[in-house]
Regions:
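HhH-family (HhH-GPD) DNA N-glycosylase catalytic core used in base-excision repair
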Residues: 1-210
């Protein structure tokens, strides 16, 4: 993934890039006449006050909960692999991963930054109860391991291994947190589209939300 030069308001840059993509698309278009009526159907109260499922998330444990969400959001990608994922009954791919991570944290305690650096593909397969014989799942677990290794090294290099110090450094600013996280390759999701660099920063924005 490529580094993106960021200046000004980061979220304005994201919105502007998305607008540029919408204006350049060839196979889809926005029906502006219906945009207002569609927007009126959106459940804004739910968006403003999101809820977290306690059965799938390790909540109520102070700094352990903080580290849980930092780790979960670090690996909140890979939906293209989810058809191959061994899911828990009635759960989506995301909730399957979240619930297995919750189970691991309850049984073994929180991960340290040093532990994240040492995680292997096999470790991830054990944590998330997946079969590495399946090639797409092996690839996903490799990506999870790389992303978590990056997180561990980042925390050790910048924050003496402290999850809390990472959040403190953001100083209650979602934008600053996103900028900090984009120092890691898996968070720096910027892609070119018809001559425009399009920043998504999906996982970084989700971490700020969580």
């Amino acid at each position: 993934m490529r580094k993106e030069k960021m200046s000004g308001n980061l979220f304005d840059e994201i919105r502007s890039a998305c607008q540029a993509v919408a204006e350049r698309t060839l196979q889809v278009r926005i029906d502006y006449d219906r945009l207002a009526s569609y927007a009126a159907t959106l459940p804004l109260e739910e968006v403003a006050r999101p809820t977290i499922d306690p059965s799938c998330h390790h909540i109520g444990h102070g700094e352990d909960t903080l580290s849980f969400f930092v780790i979960l959001d670090t690996i909140n990608f890979g939906s293209g692999y989810f058809p191959h994922l061994q899911k828990r009954p009635g759960m989506s791919g995301y909730f399957t991963i979240a619930s297995f991570l919750t189970d691991y944290c309850k049984q073994n305690g929180p991960f340290s930054a040093q532990a994240l650096v040492g995680l292997t593909t096999s470790d991830c397969a054990q944590i998330f109860v997946q079969d590495l014989v399946n090639p797409p799942i092996r690839e996903l677990m490799e990506c999870f391991a790389h992303a978590l290794n990056d997180l561990g090294r980042f925390l050790l290099a910048r924050f003496s291994g402290s999850f809390h110090s990472l959040i403190e450094e953001a100083d209650c600013s979602a934008e600053r947190l996103v900028r900090l996280l984009c120092a890691m390759p898996y968070f720096n999701d910027v892609e070119p589209y018809h001559g425009v660099d399009v920043p998504f920063y999906k996982r970084a924005q989700l971490m700020a939300s969580d």
